[in-house]
Amino acid sequence: MSQYGLTVAQQFGTSLPEYSSVGEAERNLYRERDDALQEISLHLGETLRLDYSAESLKRLERWYFENGCPQNFNSGGAVAAAMGFYFGETLRRSAQFAWIVKEFAFAKGHYEIGVSRAPLPPVSM
């Protein structure tokens, strides 16, 4: 990685939430995920038939752009963050992904949440 890339990664890392342990990070970030999923379901679930299918992702994206890329729901929750969590949960439910929380490699004590494909089981021959 170039020096510039390292600097950018470190700056980004400091923008991530800071926790004293992975356990604390998991509790808080999973709660944030759950709250965002509840909020997107409450505001758009029925209207867009959000059922965690690939087609529902298309409906959600269309709604987002047709409504001028809204920043927040009326309740104040961030739309883009909720959409990201919805995408991750769709992957988890349909494509063998799992939620993970990990410390960011370039900023000690700062954590990120995301999804990762679960390893495939060994193939018997």
Model-derived segments and their meaning:
Residues M1-F85, T90-S94, A98-M125:
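Intrinsic low-complexity, intrinsically disordered or marginally ordered coil/linker segments
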